[in-house]
Amino acid sequence: AARALLAAGVGHGERIAQLTTPRPEFMVLYAAAARIGAIWLGLNPRARYDELGYIVGDSRPRILFSIAEFEGRDYGDDVSRLFSESESAEQLVMMAPEARTPAISFEEFLAGGAKIDAATYEKACARARPGDAALIVYTSGSTGQPKGALLSQGGIVRTCLEQCRHWWAEPFRIIINVPVNHIGGAVQGATQALVAGGTNVLMERFDPAAIPGVIE
């Protein structure tokens, strides 16, 4: 996936935006972006169009990724409009078996990584540093629109190491059923399990009836 990002023109310090629930593609792109020193930004599937439009316009991602549907909401028209109105996005990728123009499927996106040779890939990875931003989290302020907060690779890892000192368990497994566009899902969930060498259990939505079975 990191090679596919490079093939699509994503460089060091540039952003990608992903409208997603907790699912494997989130983990893949989040890690791939960090690998080459790019920045991952999550978009909340429950956000209104105007909220999504503001964040995409403010963060200026090079690629827009999106699920096709969640809880009865079809995102096809909304993300196509986001893409057409964006001044920065050069590619729209739908995480679905099929994608209609102007989008391509996630599989097509990944296939593009074959264009990047080993030397180019290794050079891009070598540029990544602990101080590089890895994640943008939009958080409400006391006035005006939400503000984008930059979290560095090193800062995220150090936070997770400290959490592991206090919240250790064997085996180390974390259920992620919260939005991944914020700290709880992306850092305290996804990254902490990776840092600990543990396992992420992804649930697209919180379901009280299903939780006991998942825990067992």
Predicted segments, located by residue:
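Conserved AMP-binding/adenylate-forming
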Residues: A2-D50, G57, P179
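Conserved adenylate-forming
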Residues: Y49, G57-D58, R62, Y75-E108, ...
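Conserved AMP-binding/adenylation subdomain of ANL enzymes
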Residues: V157-R173, N181-E216
